[in-house]
From Swiss-Prot:
Catalyzed reactions per annotation: 6-carboxy-5,6,7,8-tetrahydropterin + H(+) = 7-carboxy-7-deazaguanine + NH4(+)
Positions of [4Fe-4S] cluster binding: 55, 59, 62
Family to which the UniProt record says this protein belongs: Belongs to the radical SAM superfamily. 7-carboxy-7-deazaguanine synthase family.
Protein name in the entry: 7-carboxy-7-deazaguanine synthase
Reported function: Catalyzes the complex heterocyclic radical-mediated conversion of 6-carboxy-5,6,7,8-tetrahydropterin (CPH4) to 7-carboxy-7-deazaguanine (CDG), a step common to the biosynthetic pathways of all 7-deazapurine-containing compounds.
Organism for this UniProt entry: Rickettsia prowazekii (strain Madrid E)
Cofactor needs: [4Fe-4S] cluster; S-adenosyl-L-methionine; Mg(2+)
Length: 234
């Protein structure tokens, strides 16, 4: 069954966690669940989410809980993904795995990605673009850049050629998030999405939606909606 949205959200209260090394046979995992991908390039696809623990940033609008994690063996992860991909008749009906967080690139995820690909899953990574890992070229990487102390963090040069799409979070009342910035996407003709920020305030959210639509029409960017929130699923 789809999991309901957790009412606890980070909102920048998470510790900034360090980058992990290792062979990737064990990963810090917050949760693994099946749902419908609610946003971005695979919106609407039945998906299995692997939510990894910890992040190297602490964004004060973060609407996800990712600190309640455990160190799990990769074989356990793969076994759970396989079981979740099967329907009531034991047929595989879910073919997309989304690895998110937190920040997935904080951990050595290359082995997990390759093993998922070997099992004929599509793999999508959601990252903030500040870290780099060497990943199989078949992996879809969606980058959602965040604002640092001096404006938007540029996407790492070594990551840019591998990115499938860039997603900008839009807020009318936070100046830094009220624009579509240049963070390296134009040089590689990377598709751009805009998505309104969820600020847990109906008036602010309506204003954010209006601005996101305006920016999409002005720039040609695609509008991304968090449809999973409308459906009440994670």
């Amino acid at each position: 069954m789809n999991q309901r949205i957790n009412s606890y959200k980070m909102f920048g209260h998470n510790p900034k966690r360090s980058i992990l090394s290792g062979d990737g046979t064990k990963l810090e995992v917050q949760s693994i669940f099946k749902t419908i991908q609610g946003e971005g390039i695979f919106v609407g696809y039945p998906s299995i989410f692997i939510r990894l623990g910890g992040c190297n940033l602490a964004c004060n609008f973060c609407d996800t809980e990712f600190e309640d994690f455990k160190l799990i063996d990769i074989d356990q992860i793969l076994n759970k993904v396989k079981n979740l991909s099967l329907n009531s008749k034991n047929a595989k009906t879910i073919n997309l795995v989304v690895i998110t967080g937190g920040e997935p690139m904080r951990q050595p995820i290359g082995l997990l990605c390759q093993k998922l690909l070997d099992q004929d899953f599509k793999v999508q990574i959601e990252t903030n673009g500040t870290l780099y890992r060497s990943l199989p070229k078949e992996v879809f990487i969606v980058c959602s850049p965040k604002v640092g102390k001096t404006g938007y963090n540029k996407i790492r040069e070594d990551l840019l050629p591998q990115i499938s799409a860039v997603k900008f979070i839009i807020s009318k009342n936070i100046v830094e998030y009220s624009i579509i910035p240049e963070v390296g996407q134009s040089a590689y003709d990377i598709p751009v999405f805009v998505q309104s920020m969820d600020q847990n305030d109906k008036r602010l959210n309506n204003e954010n939606n209006e601005l996101a639509v305006k920016l999409a029409l002005e720039s040609g960017a695609r509008l991304s909606l968090q449809t999973h929130k409308f459906l009440g699923i994670e």
